Amino acid sequence: MPIIKSAIKRVKTTEKANAKNSSQLSKMRTAVKKFEKAKTAGADNVEQLFNEAVSAIDKAQSKGLIKANKAARDKSRMAARLAK
């Protein structure tokens, strides 16, 4: 455990940021999985789920949780999957 006041604060802020980042990444992964599952099942709302997944990916990328290249790659693969 840290003793210095600034170190205590850093631990708190790091834990808070970690929780927020984990939540955001989880939302992104869930949105992508929902799209994949709906596409496999042939659901009607695939287009809407695609848009939600792309939005979640863009949000994660803008917050620095994933790199720009990964975001582009994931969106490209999903778009190709949607077109099939």
Swiss-Prot record:
Biological process terms in GO annotation: translation
Enumerate the Pfam families for this protein. Answer: Ribosomal_S20p
Q: Which GO terms describe its cellular component?
A: cytosol; small ribosomal subunit
- What keywords were assigned to this record? Ribonucleoprotein, Ribosomal protein, RNA-binding, rRNA-binding
**Superkingdom of this protein's organism:** Bacteria
Q: Name one GO molecular function term.
A: structural constituent of ribosome
Establish whether keyword tRNA-binding is in the entry.
no
Gene3D superfamilies the record matches: Ribosomal protein S20 (1.20.58.110)
**Similarity comment text for this entry:** Belongs to the bacterial ribosomal protein bS20 family.
HAMAP family from the xrefs?
A: Ribosomal_bS20
Summarize the protein's role: Binds directly to 16S ribosomal RNA.
Q: What is this protein called?
A: Small ribosomal subunit protein bS20
Gene for this chain: rpsT
